[in-house]
Amino acid sequence: MNRKNLQKQAEALSRLIKHFSKSEVESLIRLYHTLVGRPGDPNTRRGIDRNTFRNILHNTFGMTDDMIMDRVFRGFDKDNDSFISVTEWVEGLSVFLHGTLEEKIKYCFGVYDLNGDGYISREEMFHMLKNSLLKQPSEEDPDEGVKDLVEIALKKMDYDHDSKLSYTDFEKAVQEENLLLEAFGTCLPDSKCIMAFERQAFTEMNDI
C-alpha cells in the first residue's frame, strides 16, 4: 500500500475510532498488511483468518482458552465472514486495548454469550468456568466445584432471579464491582501485554 493510500485509509478510520490517533491507526494498518499480505499481491488473503488471530491472542496477549479465543474472534469479525477486515481489526483493537468500561462490558458480554441469544445461561457459565479452572487431581468430582461457582455467580449477578444473566444484569454487576468484568474467563489483555503490543505496533511498524 503506497503512502498516500495508507494516509487516506488511516484518516477515514481515525474518524470512526476514538481511542487511537491517526498515526497509530496508520501503524495498525501497516501491521495488518504484514499479517495478510500487501494489497494487489496474488498471495494476499481476504483478511486475518481464525488461526492467525488465535496465534496473536495466544503469543501476544497470553490467552490460552480455545473457547474464549474463538468468541473474541467472532467479536472482531462483525460481518461473520470468517475473516477480520482492516476496519474490523482497528475497531476491534480500539475496544480490546483501550475501551471504556461501558465498551468493555458490552464486549465481554458478547464473548460470554456463547450462543448469541442475549443471555449468559447457567450452561454457558459452567462450560467457561470449567475451561478456566485448573483441575485438582485430588478432586473426586471437579464438576461439583464448578457448579458451586456458577451458583455463586448467579447469586451475585442475577438481579432479576431468572437463572441467567441478561446484559442489564451483567452491566449492573460489573459497574458495582469492576473485577466481575472477566468473571467467566480472561478475554482482555493485561497492561503489560498492551504495552508490549503497542511498542511493537507503533514503534517498530513505523520503521517498515
UniProtKB/Swiss-Prot annotation:
Residues noted as binding Ca(2+) 3 in the record, renumbered to the chain: 158, 160, 162, 164, 169
BP GO terms, sorted: cilium movement; outer dynein arm assembly; regulation of cilium movement; regulation of flagellated sperm motility; regulation of signal transduction
Alphabetized GO MF terms: calcium ion binding
Ranges of residues in domain EF-hand: 64-99, 100-135, 145-180
InterPro entries reported for this sequence: EF-hand-dom_pair, EF_Hand_1_Ca_BS, EF_hand_dom, Recoverin
GO CC annotation terms, alphabetical: cilium; cytoplasm; cytoskeleton; sperm flagellum
Primary location: cytoplasm
Function text: Component of the outer dynein arm-docking complex (ODA-DC) that mediates outer dynein arms (ODA) binding onto the doublet microtubule. Seems to regulate the assembly of both ODAs and their axonemal docking complex onto ciliary microtubules. Regulates ciliary and flagellar motility and is required for cilia-driven determination of body laterality.
Protein name in UniProt: Calaxin
Organism: Xenopus laevis (African clawed frog)
